[in-house]
């Protein structure tokens, strides 16, 4: 079993416990995170470049009062993917599907597509 596959649960645990530093530790210094959603379509996605920007993004997300669960987590030596389900206290839900490329056990490129339910749905 490779290091990536044996340690992948640490990424799941970091996401579910809202541990921004634990999530950020999975990224290479020069990583690129691209997020697509209703407000940020393929022509104008949100893009975070480098560990500093990605870390700030996760500190914001992990600092929010919401529940996170990770499902369908798969990994290989060269990549990983998972579905993340989030729920805010008001009942609003977010589902995010992500795929990422790994080099030397670190995420170098990630694309995430996220959608929301209406509040309380």
Segments predicted by a language model, with ranges:
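A solvent-exposed, acidic/Ser-Thr-rich amphipathic alpha-helical stretch
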Residues: 22, 26-76
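Short, low-complexity N-terminal intrinsically disordered segments enriched in polar/charged residues
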Residues: 1-25, 29, 119-121
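Short, flexible micro-motifs
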Residues: 17, 21, 53, 108
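A beta-strand edge to alpha-helix "cap/lid" segment located at domain peripheries
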Residues: 56-121
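Hydrophobic aliphatic residue packing
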Residues: 4, 8, 41-42, 54, ...
């Amino acid at each position: 079993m490779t290091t990536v596959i044996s340690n992948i649960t640490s990424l799941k645990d970091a996401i579910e416990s809202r541990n921004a530093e634990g999530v950020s530790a999975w990224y290479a210094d020069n990583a690129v995170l691209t997020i697509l959603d209703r407000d940020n379509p393929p022509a104008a996605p949100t893009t975070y470049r480098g560990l500093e920007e990605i870390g700030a993004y996760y500190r914001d997300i992990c600092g929010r009062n919401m529940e996170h669960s990770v499902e369908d987590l798969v990994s290989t030596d060269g990549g990983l993917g998972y579905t993340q389900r989030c729920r805010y206290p008001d009942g609003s839900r977010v589902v995010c599907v992500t795929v990422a490329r790994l080099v030397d056990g670190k995420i170098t490129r990630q694309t995430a597509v996220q959608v929301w339910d209406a509040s309380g749905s």
